[in-house]
UniProtKB/Swiss-Prot annotation:
GO terms for cellular component: ribonucleoprotein complex; ribosome. This is Small ribosomal subunit protein uS8. Belongs to the universal ribosomal protein uS8 family. Keywords: Ribonucleoprotein, Ribosomal protein, RNA-binding, rRNA-binding. Part of the 30S ribosomal subunit. Contacts proteins S5 and S12. GO terms for biological process: translation. It comes from Geobacillus sp. (strain WCH70). GO terms for molecular function: rRNA binding; structural constituent of ribosome. One of the primary rRNA binding proteins, it binds directly to 16S rRNA central domain where it helps coordinate assembly of the platform of the 30S subunit.
Length: 132
């Protein structure tokens, strides 16, 4: 079966693994997925991410993060811009997620950025997802 939205698939795999408190998960790799995973790591939503070469597409192994009492760090993930309905914002329209408690991930001309980084650089782009 052809996958129409690999980013949504990655976010769903993270959401599902997080709900059952798995330590790690694997997703097929791509440059965009790798950059999104690096942002999640940098922002403290996941513990680590590593790329595994398999002479094909490659695999991203994502290590999930939980609090001291095994509470989830990621409480929500939502895909915003979809293949059937793209969502673009201008620099002054970059959204805040839960008043700054979450992040919006944007695809801009300067790469994949968080909402905060996009505001600092004064750039808009495609809103990929919200994470909180």
């Amino acid at each position: 079966m052809v996958m129409t939205d690999p980013i949504a698939d990655m976010l769903t795999r993270i959401r599902n693994a997080n709900m059952v408190r798995h330590e790690k998960l694997e997703v097929p790799a791509s440059k965009m997925k790798r950059e999104i995973a690096e942002i999640l790591k940098r922002e403290g939503f996941i513990r680590d991410v590593e790329y595994i070469e398999d002479n094909k597409q490659g695999i991203l192994r994502i290590f999930l993060k939980y609090g001291p009492n095994n509470e989830r760090v990621i409480t929500g993930l939502k895909r915003i811009s979809k293949p059937g309905l793209r969502v673009y914002v201008k620099a002054h329209e970059v959204p805040r997620v839960l008043n700054g408690l979450g992040i919006a991930i944007l695809s801009t001309s300067q790469g994949i950025l968080t909402d905060k980084e996009a505001r600092q650089k004064g750039t808009g782009g495609e809103v990929i997802a919200y994470v909180w």
